[in-house]
């Protein structure tokens, strides 16, 4: 919607523009459209009373963004971000320089596990390809670790022998010398009954762990590290698990604190050290952790919940949904910003608030009160949305990767079809940004870089921030994986020279 032009663009078997001659006609259309959208999503008339019922009285800024307090969006800005040389050109792509593109090994690529140290890993259903990390990206065909578990089954299959189900999650841990592989127990379902522990150095699956609570087998749909940087800890023995109605921490040591003797055990059991099994209806979908171990969880109903480091039982803050399921979440290292992915847009949430003593805190530490900033939406333009195709959906929205306190994330990236879409974080946070002028409703940002491949992209993610420090770029390289190729791009500062291989 372009208020200054009294124009509405939309997609329906093509891209169309609806132009209004009078300002009042345009505004009436926008108001009626938003009311109809609310009624279609929630099945309620778009009255103020029903909006408060849906969003809650503390989220009045989400209902009426024009009265929301936007000051928190620029609360933590500093001069580094305000420098014009650090700003991303609008919708430009000439400052993304392709460094390396390599074909995958036999078996292709199903997922990528980026390391912050020397290596990263390309995962498929038969093994893991080890590649080298450089300041200009990842490349080089190193050791290929073929899954070998000594005859044990792989990844939660209930039948004997190897599972033919591709690992849906690969999680690095213990100083990136080990990898946990989680595969669905049944085709078409995300739930797994356990994980396999791969020793990368020996190339062996050393243990198949079972998920169990109170003597009963249970499932998990996702796993992640305890904190943003805990995969670098060589002594790491715990990780987090998520299921539709469960949030938990798992420990690979026994209850007495001793490492389990797994040599004579067919199915060692992971210990549920803390967590909560919720009543049905939470429908958790994805989760992520901050630098201190606080947890953000996205749900099927669109809600995003924040849990502190001290309790997984009750969320400190629960942001309402906007009508679309959250399929993926990420959070900045400091916990100030949360990114949720839906099929058609990304939602960026500011978790900062001022408590009664005037101190600035995040929603992970306490109740945010009723002055909660309105979120911002990141969307494709109608033309790009049409080009992406009606069946292609956003997935895997992430911040650039920071694992140290005091560092700042600079970009956001998500994948849709053959597109990798990159937003400048500071531009999105800037309330005076040109995208937001004359907009009605929640602020939506359409300024991004668009990278295109010749096949659907599996994942788009930035390498660890330390690889920005050793190169010519202000940002670590972007890695894009398709089923057949892995490509690295450098974010040029105008001085770097690009290479094509």
UniProtKB/Swiss-Prot annotation:
Gene3D superfamilies named in the record: YVTN repeat-like/Quinoprotein amine dehydrogenase (2.130.10.10)
Protein name: Protein CYPRO4
GO cellular component term, pick one: nucleus
Organism whose genome encodes this protein: Cynara cardunculus
Family stated for the protein in its record: Belongs to the VID27 family.
